[in-house]
Amino acid sequence: MGRMFGTDGVRGVANTELTARIAYDLGRAGAYVLTEGAHKPKILVAKDTRISGDMLESALIAGILSVGAEAIVLGVVPTPAVAYLTRKYGADAGVMISASHNPVEYNGIKFFNDKGYKLSDELEDEIQRVIESDFEGVPSPTGTDLGRETIEVSALDDYIEFAKNTIPYSLKGLKIALDCANGAAYKSSVKAFRELGADVFVINDNPDGTNINENCGSTHPEELMEYVIKKKCDLGFAFDGDADRCLAVDEKGNLINGDFILMLCAKYLKELGKLKDDTLVVTVMSNLGLDIACKNEKINIVKTAVGDRYVLEEMVKNKYVLGGEQSGHVIFLDYNSTGDGLVTALQIAGIVKKKEKALSELCSIMKELPQVLANATIPNDKKDLYLTDDEIQNEIRKIEEALNGVGRVLIRPSGTEPLVRVMLEGENQAEIDEMAHNLANLIEKKYN
C-alpha cells in the first residue's frame, strides 16, 4: 500500500476510496497510537456538513471505542474548533471528518494530537503501520473496558467564546457579509459576529448535506463579492467547507486573498509590537507583491514548502506568531494551533474597526503581481516525473528567460488530488496566462 496520509490527512471519494472500513481502521489505529498507555483516553470527533460525514463518523467512533477509548462527539464544528477544544477539554487527541474545500463526494479524516497540532509524518506512518500489521498487539477489550460515546453539547459555544475573546472590543457599527459555504461555519461565524455587535448579512448558511462548497465559499467568492455591494457592507468573509480558512471582500466588492490578509495583519501586529522578530511566515506560492510590501514595511519573510503544516512547523520551531497561505489559511499561533477562518475574519474586522479606515485603503499597502495557476490532471504515481523530464525542464527555462527576472515559474504536485499545479507570475497577464496553460497542457499530454 502507498502512503495513506496526504498533506492534510487521509482523503478520497467517500464510500469508494474512503470507506467505512478505512474509517474504522483509522479510528482503531489512531486511538491506539495516540493514546498508548493512557487509561480510558478521550478522543474528540467532529465533522463538516457532508452527507458522508454520518457514515464515516459512525465507523470512526466504532474504531475508537473498540480499543477502550472514549469518543467525545462534537457534531458539526469547524476544524479549528477541534484543535482548540482538544486542548481545552484535556483530550488525548481530536479527529476531524472533512475534505475542506473539495467537492461533496470527497471526504477526509485528519487527526490532532493532545496539543491541538496536526500529526507529524512519523506518527501518521505509525498509524498506517498498525493498520498494515492487521492490528498486531492492539488490545480488543471486552465488557466494562470498552469505550463509551458521549455528546458534548457545549462544544460550539465554547469555541465561539474562545474566538470572540481574540478581539477585545465590540464590532458595533460594522456591516459584515458572511458566506458560510454551506459548511461547518454556518452557525459559529454568524453567532460570533452578531454577539460582538456587528450588523451581519449571511448567504449559504443552509447546509443540506450535498451543497457544501457548491458555487460558494472561499473557492467561489463571486456571489459574496456581489452581495457585499448589494447590501452596502463594510466588508465580507468567505469560509471554506471546514472553516479553517477565509478570504475577505472589501467594501468595493474586491476579493482580498490570503497574501493581502497576511500583510494587513503583519503590519498591524508590528505596530503593536506583537510580531515576533518582525517576521511573517509564508509559502513559496505567495505573490512577489507580498515580498515587496514586506520590504517596504521592514517586515522579514520566511518561506516554506506549500501546505499550512509546513508554515506551522516553521512557526513553532522559531516561535513566530503569524503565518499562512494565499488560499486564506492564516495561523495566529498566539490563539490557535491551526488555520482558523473565524479568528482570521475577526482580526480583520477588528483592524478595520480600530483603524477607522476602509478595508480597500488598508490593503493598498500591497500591489499584487499578475499570477496564473493552471492544473495538469495526471495520475498520482506520475506526479513527480516532470522533475527529470528534459523537454519539460527545457520549456521551464525558456519561460524563465522570457520573464527576464520579473516573475517566476513554480510547479508542484497537489497533495490531495491527481493534479500538478503550474503557477506563473509576471508583469503581463495575457502572456503568463498563455505560458502557464501551454506548460500544463504539455505535462498533461506527456503523462496520460
From Swiss-Prot:
GO terms for molecular function: magnesium ion binding; phosphoglucosamine mutase activity; phosphomannomutase activity. Mg(2+) binds at residues 100, 240, 242, 244. Transmembrane segments: none annotated. Activated by phosphorylation. NCBIfam families: glmM, PRK10887.1. It catalyses: alpha-D-glucosamine 1-phosphate = D-glucosamine 6-phosphate. One of its GO terms (cellular component) is cytosol. Pfam families: PGM_PMM_I, PGM_PMM_II, PGM_PMM_III, PGM_PMM_IV. InterPro entries: A-D-PHexomutase_a/b/a-I (IPR005844), A-D-PHexomutase_a/b/a-I/II/III (IPR016055), A-D-PHexomutase_a/b/a-II (IPR005845), A-D-PHexomutase_a/b/a-III (IPR005846), A-D-PHexomutase_C (IPR005843), A-D-PHexomutase_C_sf (IPR036900), A-D-PHexomutase_CS (IPR016066), Alpha-D-phosphohexomutase_SF (IPR005841). Gene3D superfamilies: Alpha-D-Glucose-1,6-Bisphosphate, subunit A, domain 3, Alpha-D-phosphohexomutase, C-terminal domain. Catalyzes the conversion of glucosamine-6-phosphate to glucosamine-1-phosphate. The keyword Lipoprotein does not apply. It comes from Clostridium beijerinckii (strain ATCC 51743 / NCIMB 8052) (Clostridium acetobutylicum). The keyword NADP does not apply. One of its GO terms (biological process) is UDP-N-acetylglucosamine biosynthetic process. Binds 1 Mg(2+) ion per subunit. This is Phosphoglucosamine mutase. The active site is at 100 (phosphoserine intermediate). Keywords: Isomerase, Magnesium, Metal-binding, Phosphoprotein.
